[in-house]
Structure formats: C-alpha cells, structure tokens
C-alpha cells in the first residue's frame, strides 16, 4: 500500500468521502492542514497550487492528485470500493456525481452560515434538496434488502451520498 497523505482544511467538505472510505477499509493515511503542508497561509500559496483548490492527495511523497472526484476514484480503485463491471461502474459513478452536486448548496449553509442567515438558507435548502433525496430513495428501493445502493457491499458512491 502506498503512503497516503490527504491535505485539506479543518472542515467537513470535499475531503470527507475519501476519509470515510479510508477509515472504512482501515487504510493508513495521514491528514495535514494546508498551512502545515505548504508551510505558509493558504491565501499566500493558493495561486501556485494546481487548480487553486484543495483537497490534495499526496501518494508516496511524490505524486499529487488534485480534485476530490479524482481522489475518490483513485482511492476506490486502490482500496477496492469500485465495481469491476463497466456498466455497474457507470451507475455507481452517476450516483457519486449526483451526490457531489449536493455540495454547492450544502457547503455555504452548513459550514459558513450562522443565525438568521442559517435559518433562511436551511429552509431554502430543504426545499431544493427534497427531489434529490427522492432520487436516492428510488435507487435504494431498487435493491431491496441490501444495505447499500448497489448491493451488500459499499462502493465509493455510498460514501459520497452518506457524507452529503
């Protein structure tokens, strides 16, 4: 198993699904705050970082994988949380992508809004997300008597939906 280091911030957001996957499989990794990894405040280093955003997965101290979806898919292959069948993989990936689309409305509400602004945003959010949750429920219902979206064992999409 390669040495894995996940670099992000102190918040539940784009690095959460990869962390859940790593914990579920008992895969060793380290978690480093962006300012510690880069040795300076994020605002000072952001423009020099590929895509100007995090998370970042560092593999064996040399290979850097950016973008949360790429990190999740890489880890899913590494720790066997993706199906071998190409058609099932497409379904799993579609569900994962749908779960990631929840991030845009959720993140500002959950991680940054407070007081009256939070209450207002929460009401709008519940109305906006209800149809998405119905979609997830429909997929779960198509696999009766299984604990995960596509059977008895989880795939990376399950962690994406669970987190969001």
Residue ranges and their predicted role:
Residues 92, 149-164:
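GST superfamily/GST-like fold recognition
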């Amino acid at each position: 198993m390669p040495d894995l280091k996940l670099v992000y911030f102190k918040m539940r957001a784009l690095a959460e699904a990869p962390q859940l996957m790593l914990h579920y499989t008992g895969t060793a990794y380290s978690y480093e705050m962006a300012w510690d990894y880069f040795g300076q405040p994020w605002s000072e280093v952001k423009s020099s970082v590929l895509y100007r955003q995090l998370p970042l997965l560092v593999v064996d101290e040399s290979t850097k994988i950016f973008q949360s979806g790429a990190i999740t898919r890489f880890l899913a292959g590494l720790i066997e949380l993706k199906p071998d069948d190409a058609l099932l993989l497409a379904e799993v990936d579609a569900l994962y992508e749908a779960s990631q689309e929840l991030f845009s409305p959720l993140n500002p509400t959950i991680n940054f809004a407070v007081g009256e602004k939070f209450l207002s945003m929460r009401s709008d959010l519940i109305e906006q997300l209800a149809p998405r949750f119905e979609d997830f429920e429909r997929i779960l219902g198509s696999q009766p008597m299984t604990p995960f979206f596509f059977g008895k064992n989880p795939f990376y999409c399950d962690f994406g939906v669970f987190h969001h």
